[in-house]
Swiss-Prot record:
LRR repeats lie at residues 244-266, 267-290, 319-343, 345-369, 371-395, 396-420, 446-470. It comes from Homo sapiens. GO terms for biological process: SCF-dependent proteasomal ubiquitin-dependent protein catabolic process. This is F-box/LRR-repeat protein 16. The lineage of its organism: Eukaryota, Metazoa, Chordata, Craniata, Vertebrata. One of its GO terms (cellular component) is cytosol. Keywords: Leucine-rich repeat, Methylation, Repeat, Ubl conjugation pathway.
Amino acid sequence: MSSPGIDGDPKPPCLPRNGLVKLPGQPNGLGAASITKGTPATKNRPCQPPPPPTLPPPSLAAPLSRAALAGGPCTPAGGPASALAPGHPAERPPLATDEKILNGLFWYFSACEKCVLAQVCKAWRRVLYQPKFWAGLTPVLHAKELYNVLPGGEKEFVNLQGFAARGFEGFCLVGVSDLDICEFIDNYALSKKGVKAMSLKRSTITDAGLEVMLEQMQGVVRLELSGCNDFTEAGLWSSLSARITSLSVSDCINVADDAIAAISQLLPNLAELSLQAYHVTDTALAYFTARQGHSTHTLRLLSCWEITNHGVVNVVHSLPNLTALSLSGCSKVTDDGVELVAENLRKLRSLDLSWCPRITDMALEYVACDLHRLEELVLDRCVRITDTGLSYLSTMSSLRSLYLRWCCQVQDFGLKHLLALGSLRLLSLAGCPLLTTTGLSGLVQLQELEELELTNCPGATPELFKYFSQHLPRCLVIE
C-alpha cells in the first residue's frame, strides 16, 4: 500500500474478482464533473401580489459551489442567502449531499468506483462508509501495503480505521509473515472479535503464527490457507478451534493424511471443507466420523490424485448429508465411485466430476437415475462422455447448470437431448470441437436460458451470435 487514503485507509490498486476486492488508491476520479443549479427569471406584475419565494429548481444556469459539494450551505444564483425575504422556507440540502438521494444513487456503482467516490467529500464518504455498501466484499492486502515508510526509513503500520468503519467481516492477506499477522491483530481494532473470515495466501506463516492468530482472533469461523508452505500438520493440531465452520486448504506442501485427522477430530461443527492436496490418500478419508456427518454439507476434494473409489466409500458412509461434492481432478475415481455417490448421497444439489478422465456415460446414467435433486453438474474435461451420456441427463428436471467444457466427443445429436431440460439456466459448451452452427442454433428452444458459454467452439460464428441475440434476448452469450 503506497500511501494512506481517507482516515488512513491503505490504497492498493483495484482488483475485483471472485468476490475479492482490492481497495484502490486513485485520486478524486470525478474530474471536472459538476452539479448545477439556477434561478428562472421572474417579472413583477403590478396588479397581482408577488408570489411567495420558492426554492429555485435545478437547471444548468450556474454551477454549485465547492462548499455545497462538501456539504456546506447552498447559495441560489439570485444572490446570497442573507438576501432571502423573512419567512423564507428552510432550504433543503443540495442534491449533491442529500443523503436520501445518495443512499439510492451509490447502489449503482461498483466497489472500486465507491472507493473513489468516497474521496470526493466528507458527506459522500459518510454515506458510502455504511457497511451495507460493502457487504460480501473482502479487502485484499499485500504485505508491502501494510506499512508506510517514514522519512527516516522506519516503517509504521497503516491506519485501518476506514476498514473498521465499513464493517468488513473478512480479510485476505497475501505474502505475510508471522510478524505481519501480529501487527495486523495489534493495529486493527476489530481483529479480535469483529473479523469472522481470514484468508492467507502465499504467506510464510508458521505453526506458531497460526496458533497465535486463531487464539487472538476469537471471531474467526472461516479460514483459508493457500500456498502457505511453512506450517505443518502439527500446527493444525495445535491451532484449530471447534468454532471453525469453514476450512479451505490448498497448495500447502506439508498437508497430508494427518491433517485430515486433525480436521476431523478438532472441528465437530465443520460445515464446509475444501481440500487440494496431492498427497492425501484414501486413508485420510477414513478419519471422517458421524460427528461430521451431521454438520458437514459441502466437501471439495480438488486434485487429490491418490484418492480412489475406496476413499469415496468412506466419504459417502461418513458424510450422508452432503449437498455439494466435488471430486474435480481425482483422476483415479471411476464410474463405480460415481455409482456409490449416486446411491448414497441423495441430497446432493451440486456435483463436480471435472477432470476425471475415467468417467464414462455409465456414470451419467447413475447420476440421472438417483440424484433427482441435482441442480448443478460439472463435467469439464470428461473426455469419454458422449451423446449417449447426455441422453441420460435429459430426464433431470431439476438441473439448472450444466458444464461440458472440452468434452470432445459431444456432437449435435447430444445437444438435442438437452432441449428437454426446461429448467436449465446455464450451459457451457466451451471447447467442444464437434458442435456445428446448425446444432448450436437449436439451443434457442431453451427460452429460460440465462447464460450460454461458447468460447473456442468452431461452430460458434458471428451469424450464430446474431441469431441468438434475436431469439434469446435475455441470455448472456459468452463468445
